[in-house]
Amino acid sequence: MSGHSFFEHLFEHSQHVTPYLHGAIKPRPERCAEHGFIHIEHASSDHIRALYESLKLAHPEAGAAYWLTRTWTLLCWQPLYVAFIAIYSCQGLPKLSSMGQHVQPRFVSGYQFDDDEYRQGSEQELIAHAGKELCALFDYFRQEMSLWTRIRPGFTQHLFADGVFGCLVKLSQFYPTLSGDYFLEQARLWLAACQLPEKLIQSLRYDETSRQLSLVRTSCCLVYKCQGRELCRDCPRHPDNKRE
């Protein structure tokens, strides 16, 4: 498949997953600082802090832990989704670490690449490479944020793993005929590739009767601290998810 065809498929599948995930191939803005654009080759600390401050302004009652958690989750959701869509729907992988993203008040939506280069390989090979690329990109986010706040690697690791598992659950909904063993093996591959503790796989459950994969997160997004919001269904704080 040509690079052009691969990215056409990637962008089309992205839009089917969610209209907020719109991609493009185009040059980076000449002045990234003026366009709310974050990229690993540019300083993005101010853009990320502006995102944090917009969340603080919108939800002052939620507190600093929520603003930080939400900021991190917003930075990471598109690269994770693109990795999964590329590997499982398009059988390839773009250079995730060079993915640019567009930051708006309280949200991150829209991504782009400079060119149509992509990698081909087996699922296992692509997952291994995706893990390296995501680790590099997320390390960059953490370094940029550490210029103005404290953000621990242990904190981001749990959010990273929950993000990966959340994508696996969505994948299982798109491909309900695949077995539970398949999804659990994929989870192990992703954890190894992303240098995440294998014990976190205990967050996943597969019900043979309903053929459904489910997740109880190890991290809490803290959205319940926002006025009018409740605990998420996969939250570890939810009463239904309390372990006896």
UniProtKB/Swiss-Prot annotation:
Coiled-coil annotated spans: none
Alphabetic keyword roster: 2Fe-2S, Cytoplasm, Iron, Iron-sulfur, Metal-binding, NAD, NADP, Oxidoreductase
Top-level EC class as recorded in UniProt: oxidoreductase
Iron in keyword set: yes
Stretch forming the signal peptide: none
EC number from the UniProt entry: 1.16.1.10
Main location: cytoplasm
pH dependence statement: Optimum pH is 8.5 with Fe(3+)-nitrilotriacetic acid (NTA) as electron acceptor.
GO CC annotation: cytoplasm
Pfam families recorded: FhuF_C (PF11575)
Cofactor remark from the record: Binds 1 [2Fe-2S] cluster.
Function: Ferric-siderophore reductase involved in iron removal from the siderophores after their transport into the cell. Acts as a major ferric-aerobactin reductase catalyzing the reduction of Fe(3+)-aerobactin, a citrate-hydroxamate siderophore produced by other bacteria. Catalyzes reduction of Fe(3+)-vulnibactin, a catecholate siderophore synthesized by V.vulnificus, in the absence of VuuB. Catalyzes reduction of ferrioxamine B and Fe(3+)-vibriobactin in vitro. No activity with Fe(3+)-enterobactin.
Subunit field text: Monomer.
Name of the protein this chain belongs to: Ferric aerobactin reductase IutB
